[in-house]
């Protein structure tokens, strides 16, 4: 298997340089008519993956929005990473803390 950088460069050559963030914060889930729980996280994230697969090379789930639901939220994050890979998307998990507010 090639390096992540090589796979990213190849995907960017084909699909361009965009990376879609997956930031399922409570107000956004509410806007989508989804509950602020692990089922809402899963529905939002999988719908996002379906919408962007084949359009962008990568997605970036924000770990904190999943972690706030405890171990069940982390399990959903793992599902999302696996589902993204199955759809041919590269994954960059955003797990930094304290750098900026929500963007």
Q: Where are the language model's segments positioned?
A:
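Active-site loop-to-helix "anion-binding N-cap" substructures in soluble metabolic enzymes
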Residues: 1-103
């Amino acid at each position: 298997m090639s390096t992540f950088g090589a796979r990213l460069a190849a995907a960017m050559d084909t699909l361009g340089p965009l990376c879609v963030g997956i930031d399922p914060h409570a107000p956004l889930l509410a806007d989508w008519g989804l509950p602020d729980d692990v089922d809402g996280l899963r529905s939002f994230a999988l719908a996002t993956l379906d919408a962007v697969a084949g359009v962008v090379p990568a997605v970036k789930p924000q770990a904190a929005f999943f972690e706030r639901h405890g171990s069940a939220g982390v399990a959903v994050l793992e599902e999302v990473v696996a589902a993204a890979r199955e759809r041919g998307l590269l994954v960059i998990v955003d797990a930094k803390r304290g750098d900026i507010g929500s963007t």
